[in-house]
């Protein structure tokens, strides 16, 4: 025992008698930055009457991740072109003349810029399609008045993309996917956007007393 800390004797304990830190213990992350949901304590404990509020993802972080994925693809294309140049040079040394043309650094840069521009344009179009899909409820109201759907509107009814397996640290991507899933679920059940949580059940509670009053008279 050292400084009145630890076991009085290490005999039979299988230890040295000193208190050590447990490095295998992992504290669950239920609060602080990056937590999926805020803790229910203090001021939040009295907010049980409020409706459920979905956590909104950070748009800047999501855009940064998408642009980073674009740069990764551009870098992979650059490495592929450079390896292709090395292969052509090796074949040219062995046979006297290569089958293909060796690209210069400027040509490689032009191809990479063209690929980057195309991927960024596709990313913007994907964001626009997501924004258009958010107006699905308004389109349904227009359909009831005889409005005909166009080819672009039919694209919104396509099945969602294959779900990705998110990592534990991808909280913003997971929140965005959860919001999209909730929107599809609301659209499938015909739930309006302005419907609050518990509104349907509270309306049923008001309906029961009125029904008993009518039966009594």
Curated annotation (Swiss-Prot):
InterPro entries: CWC21, mRNA_splic_Cwf21_dom. It comes from Aspergillus fumigatus (strain ATCC MYA-4609 / CBS 101355 / FGSC A1100 / Af293). The keyword NAD does not apply. The gene is cwc21. One of its GO terms (cellular component) is spliceosomal complex. Belongs to the CWC21 family. The keyword Transcription regulation does not apply. GO terms for biological process: mRNA processing; RNA splicing. Residues 65-135 form a coiled coil. Associates with the NTC complex (or PRP19-associated complex). The NTC complex associates with the spliceosome after the release of the U1 and U4 snRNAs and forms the CWC spliceosome subcomplex reminiscent of a late-stage spliceosome. Residues 30-108, 122-217 are annotated as: Disordered. This is Pre-mRNA-splicing factor cwc21. It is found in: Cytoplasm; Nucleus. Residues 62-122 form the CWF21 domain.
